[in-house]
UniProtKB/Swiss-Prot annotation:
Organism encoding this protein: Cauliflower mosaic virus (strain NY8153) (CaMV)
Family: Belongs to the caulimoviridae capsid protein family.
Keyword Transferase: no
GO molecular function terms noted in the UniProt entry: nucleic acid binding; structural molecule activity; zinc ion binding
Free-text function comment from the UniProt entry: Self assembles to form an icosahedral capsid, about 50 nm in diameter, nm, composed of 420 subunits of the viral capsid protein. The capsid encapsulates the genomic dsDNA. Following virus entry into host cell, provides nuclear import of the viral genome. Virus particles do not enter the nucleus, but dock at the nuclear membrane through the interaction with host importins.
Disulfide bond entries: none
Official protein name in the record: Capsid protein
Annotated Basic and acidic residues bias: 94-129
Zinc finger annotations (CCHC-type) as residue ranges: 410-427
Main subcellular localisation: virion
Region (Disordered): 78-137, 463-488
UniProt keyword annotations, A-Z: Capsid protein, Host nucleus, Metal-binding, T=7 icosahedral capsid protein, Viral penetration into host nucleus, Virion, Virus entry into host cell, Zinc, Zinc-finger
Motif (Nuclear localization signal): 120-123
Compartments where located: Virion; Host nucleus
Amino acid sequence: MAESILDRTINRFWYNLGEDCLSESQFDLMIRLMEESLSGDQIIDLTSLPSDNLQVEQVMTTTEDSISEESEFLLAIGETSEDESDSGEEPEFEQVRMDRTGGTEIPKEEDGEPSRYNERKRKTTEDRYFPTQPKTIPRQKQTSMGMLNIDCQTNRRTLIDDWAAEIGLIVKTNREDYLNPETILLLMEHKTSGIAKELIRNTRWNRTTGDIIEQVIDRMYTMFLGLNYSDNKVAEKIDEQEKAKIRMTKLQLCDICYLEEFTCDYEKNMYKTELADFPGYINQYLSKIPIIGEKALTRFRHEANGTSIYSLGFERKICKEELSKIRDLSKNEKKLKKFNKKCCSIEEASAEYGCKKTSTKKYHKKRYKKKYKAYKPYKKKKKFRSGKYFKPKEKKGSKQKYCPKGKKDCRCWICNIEGHYANECPNRQSSEKAHILQQAEKVGLQPIEAPYEGVQEVFILEYKEEEEETSTEESDDESSTSEDSDSD
């Protein structure tokens, strides 16, 4: 009966461990239980505990040894804890120590403090809804080392170079395993993925002559980088050197704060050229640096010797030293500005009299700045006035009529004759209208030069027209009567 209880308890332990349902106290309790109950023939592999799903492969061989009373007591505690866990609440366990000789140690009450063994901890909301989980090793993201995948990558050349270096190292350190080109191709095929793997698999390689690794790398350069390394490798390298020289010539440094970025770009292109040309490119590099370039070039010519002539790092070191000097000088200048000259009592007598004009400090009037208001002042909206921005009408009388022909074509309103105005009319003194015109001029009125104005003129005009009509009618009647008489 005891053996069946032990097996059942251990099986439940492994089942709960796989589902992350055990608390720390339950985990420690079951480990101690297995240590006490298992004999030397029983083996449990606990090395694979921090796996992905916390599933443990164990090899157990049960024996027919009797279980001690202490283990039965612990099993009873475990069964009660399982019943509580089935009810939906997390059980609370107290840490119980177990002696090898037998018997359990129950924590004793200290002076003034209740026993933790008998005291129940009050559950909080966090403990009920978010039960604590056993501490485990976090899952580590496994990355495939040495795998080449250049699908949709921008730095393809860097990836190919790193992969080729690793493949070459594997082949050279294990020459006995990679004597056959087939094995090398198999290794390269398993170390690639994507389009690179398809290239190695579908290409017919020359396995008799040449280095198979170099063939694969040259073909990758041709297919993925557009460099014709397979057919004309020398011409491609010469073309790269020419592009690097043009790039170094075009590089400029306008701000000394970008010295590191400028040096990195220049150095990357310089190492694509021949080693014998390095001193000339270093002098060109120093001539492009502002502020400290001349001093650094002078120091480089005096201090460089041997292999340091070909070293751009040596020149970078000199530039950093010159920059540190300028930085220290600027710090000292800032300190001198804060230095109070009045505190220094040791002064030499001036040897110049009247050489320097004393100048007073210019007074700058501080402009008044309106205080900021948090609220917007309310202004009453003014009533709309039409014609506010237009020129007002003149109150004087109308101006004289403009005669565009340059001569007086207007008709005089006194004598109704064209050729002169009313103020120049010779009949104005003898006529009553002339007296009216004189009185109007005294008041400030001017005559209107439009003809046929006034009641009298219109009447006269109509009267004259009627007289003319009657005369024409009489003439017509006379002509008609004469014709009738002739016909008779």
